[in-house]
Amino acid sequence: LRTIRAGALASLVESGHPFASLVNVAADYDGSPLLLLSRLAAHTLNLERDPRCSVLLSQGGKGDPLAHPRLTIVGSAARTEAEHVRSRFLRRHPKSELYAGFADFSFWRITVERAHLNGGFARAADFSGEAVLTPLDGAEALLAAESGAIEHMNADHREALSLYATRLLGERDGPWRATGFDPEGMDLSAGDRTARLTFDKMVATPGDLRSTLVHLATRARALAHSPAQD
């Protein structure tokens, strides 16, 4: 939900038949899928008529595609003009800024009603929307500070971001940048690659976030200098 950059959006045509299309996906603070759609596209016309939809997000990988995890989100889509939605989407998909301002494009948010997780053969389960989303109660100060925190980390702490990705998450080295903060973790990207750093405990304020990031950076540096990592 936090790391997949594109998915299959299923909307409904007038006859009631499902219509699947490939779309870029980002995540709101709570994990709700965010989309940037052209009103000229068939799926947008479908959503304007009937907001019910689903999005399939697949991790993919080598071998049998059905052996890898995938998540289906079921809900309703609605246009949104929230500035943070635009910022979050474009940090995940910076090339989309080329057309995000076109008159026929708008941002959409899917209200999650339920989810179906399939972790591979014989490993499937259904969840309520509440179960898969991040609770935001009491985190208003953190969310308000997100843009500033991201700008600060990307400008002044690129080494720490690289250490988070490579030492704590096992990712390959690259130009890692922060793209989002929420009470449960931090989203990172390096080109087309994405990663999710989950915090040890929920954070609710900028102070909580700073303390957590300092602690994680200390842990990552320790791993970087340990004999096992050399």
Predicted feature residues:
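An N-terminal domain-cap segment
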Residues: 1-48, 54-56
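C-terminal edge-of-domain segments
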Residues: 98-230
